[in-house]
Regions:
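Conformational switch/transducer regions in large eukaryotic molecular machines and scaffolds
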Residues: 1-148
């Protein structure tokens, strides 16, 4: 994977898009994060999964590929969130104010080691920068099936 690299794999089902993504991730030595879609999976579950992904990449500082395919698009908001991740590294309003102190505490030591500062704004910026550096979004799309 290229630094801050992402990928979109387009092809018919069964052509090896997901296998290729997993192979590339393995070769790069990074983990793969895949969400499990169920019948009742909606925006609340999606946002919880995004928080887990951000904790892995932003707090734990673990390089991770997020593999997402078009059959997992249950709501258009999923695609909007992916667009936000790709453009800015964050999802607006993902966290409530009560969740932020745990994030700040999780990145405080690494931020201090990087001489990044210790204000809430600086810790948030460090968290987002860690996500942008560690998260690689891989979209596996099948053009005729993609509703968006």
């Amino acid at each position: 994977m290229m630094p801050r690299g992402n990928a979109m794999l387009v092809g018919v089902g069964g052509s090896g898009r997901q296998s290729l993504a997993r192979l590339a991730s393995h070769i790069a030595g990074i983990g793969v994060f895949v969400i499990e879609i169920t019948k009742l999976y909606r925006l609340i579950e999606w946002r919880d999964d995004m928080k887990r992904l951000f904790e892995i990449t932003g707090v734990s500082n673990t390089p991770t590929a997020f593999l997402f395919n078009d059959t997992q698009l249950k709501e258009q908001a999923f695609l909007e969130d992916i667009n936000n991740i790709l453009s800015s590294g964050e999802i607006p309003s993902l966290y409530g104010k009560d969740e932020l102190p745990a994030i700040y505490d999780g990145v405080r030591k690494r931020a201090a080691d990087a001489e990044s500062g210790g204000t809430a704004e600086e810790l948030w910026a460090f968290f987002i920068e860690s996500i942008r550096s560690n998260l690689h979004v891989i979209l596996a799309m099948s053009q005729p099936l993609c509703p968006y």
